[in-house]
A protein has these predicted regions:
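Short, charge-rich amphipathic alpha-helical segments embedded
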Residues: 82-99
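Boundary regions of SH3-family modules and the immediately adjacent low-complexity/disordered segments
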Residues: 108-168, 212-255
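SH3/SH3-like beta-barrel superfamily modules
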Residues: 186-228
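Positively charged n-region of N-terminal signal peptides that target proteins for export
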Residues: 1-7
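Short, low-complexity N-terminal intrinsically disordered segments enriched in polar/charged residues
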Residues: 24-64, 76
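Short, well-ordered alpha-helical segments enriched in acidic and aromatic residues
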Residues: 70-81
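Boundary at the C-terminal end of the N-terminal hydrophobic targeting segment
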Residues: 19-23
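Bacterial N-terminal signal peptides
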Residues: 7-16
């Protein structure tokens, strides 16, 4: 299970993903999300860590390269050829470029003012991973939690929401508070169920996330006590030489 301290690194990505979904220009506008109200509780099991000492050592190297913004060191940790970058419209990797160049494009590492290196460090700190069925021998992180997909689809239809509106607690008994303050009254403690997130407007990343509980009550939880559903993922492969970054799944850099 991802610990709270590790998930906290993804706090900025959590809010970025919610904000991106709300601010992107769209074509035909979908119906507005249903107002806060009760919804069916869908059980969720957090992802498990990969039990492999070599993977832990690899992530440490990856984190060190990210902290130093050392592209040369990073290049040694990425496949030379065969890197994939899966987006909604297919594989966007440039097969004429090296793996590290494609990874840099996916994360926006060439943007000095961007968060690409911080995102890379965040990925490196996550010990979870799940297999990518269409690519044998590939695992991607952060791994998604386990839940009933059919029930989740029905839940999104009932609430007129999409994947980006949902999160899950990283541990049992996460405290929900009446206000976004550490000393605010605790209104309830959460079970291991999917949660509807309703972030408040604002450019700063807050300490608390506004949510709607299955009972339909609005409350606030510490942002590092939950994790998003459907996050971007970085993917790894392992061969005779060890672990390598082999691909990326998600929107990546907008440039």
């Amino acid at each position: 299970m991802r610990s709270i301290c590790l998930v906290s690194i993804f706090a900025s990505l959590l809010f970025a993903s919610f904000a991106l979904g709300q601010n992107q220009p769209r074509g035909p506008q979908p119906p507005p999300p249903a107002k806060a109200g009760p919804y069916k509780a869908v059980s969720v099991t957090p992802p498990q860590a990969i039990s492999d000492a070599t993977f832990e050592a690899f992530r440490k190297q990856m984190n060190e390269a990210a902290q130093r913004k050392d592209r040369g060191a990073l290049a040694k940790l990425v496949v030379g050829q065969g890197f994939f970058w899966l987006r909604e419209n297919g594989d966007r990797a440039d097969k004429n470029k090296s793996g590290v160049d494609n990874l840099a494009a996916a994360l926006g590492l060439n943007n000095k003012d961007g968060a690409g290196w911080d995102m890379l460090a965040s990925f490196a700190d996550d010990p979870t991973g799940s297999s990518l069925p269409e690519r044998k021998g590939t695992v991607c992180a952060p791994a998604d939690p386990t839940f009933d997909g059919k029930a989740f689809n029905e839940l999104m239809q009932a609430t007129q929401t999409d994947v980006g509106d949902w999160a899950y607690p990283v541990s049992r008994d996460v405290e929900v508070r009446a206000l976004p303050q550490p000393n605010a009254p605790v209104t309830e403690k959460l079970g291991m169920v999917l949660l509807r997130a309703m972030p408040e407007d604002g450019s700063n990343i807050p300490t608390f996330l506004r949510i709607v509980t299955p009972a339909g009550k609005i409350g606030y939880v510490l942002v590092d006590s939950v994790a998003p559903i459907g996050n971007d993922q970085i993917c790894y492969v392992k061969d005779a030489s060890g672990w390598k970054i082999g691909g990326y799944i998600g929107g990546g850099d907008t440039q």
